[in-house]
Design a protein with these regions (language model features):
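Conserved catalytic loops of ABC-family nucleotide-binding domains
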Residues: 137-147, 155
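Helix-to-loop junction immediately C-terminal to a conserved catalytic motif
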Residues: 3
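ABC ATPase nucleotide-binding domain helical subdomain, centered on the C-loop/LSGGQ "ABC signature"
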Residues: 12-14, 48-89, 133-134, 142
Length: 178
């Protein structure tokens, strides 16, 4: 619904800005999102080519910064060809957690105002997940980050908690310490 790929059966889905302005979610609002799903979304090619899917003219410095934010730089820089290492479709040649971190780095590099992480840290251990979330808060202070998770530990980085139940979204906590 948030990406305008499906629409509610009744009512409407809107984005509400800090100033109260409402924008109805549609295919046109999709460009405001960087989306990282649970499964691998990497393509056959180099790591750099995968990152540049988000920002075609990304510099080495920008890619390095995004990889560091996603806790991927340490393993990418240790590969024989670094960001020029070839991977296969769906991140073949990498662990699932490594592929998730590269997908997160790609989303960071895109720089959209809303980052949607849909179980995007599910293959990470708790320590790495916590560091990725801390890094995102630091590196993207003006980006709205929407996190869907089944892991309670990730919730401590959220300023608002919502519960989806019976087709409704309900705010259950606001202004939690990050």
């Amino acid at each position: 619904v948030l990406l305008g790929l499906v629409y509610p059966e009744s009512g409407r889905a809107v984005l509400r800005g800090k100033n109260g302005c409402e924008i109805v979610i549609s295919a046109e609002t999709r460009c405001a999102f960087s989306y990282v799903p649970q499964g691998s979304t990497l393509f056959s090619g180099t790591i750099a080519e995968n990152l540049r899917m988000a920002k075609e003219n990304a510099t080495e410095e920008e890619m390095t910064a995004a990889l560091k934010t996603a806790c991927a730089w340490a393993f990418v820089s240790s590969l024989p060809n670094g960001v020029n290492t070839k991977i296969t479709e769906r991140g073949g040649g990498l662990s699932e957690g490594q592929a998730q971190r590269i997908a997160i780095a790609r989303a960071v590099l895109r720089g959209a105002p809303i980052l949607l992480l849909d179980e995007a840290t599910s293959a990470l251990d708790e320590k790495t997940e916590a560091q990725v979330l801390k890094n995102l808060l630091t590196a993207l202070p003006d980006t709205a980050c929407i996190l869907t998770t089944h892991r309670p530990g990730a919730l401590k980085y959220c300023t608002r908690l919502y519960k989806a139940e019976n087709g409704a979204l309900t705010c259950i906590e606001v202004n939690r310490p990050a």
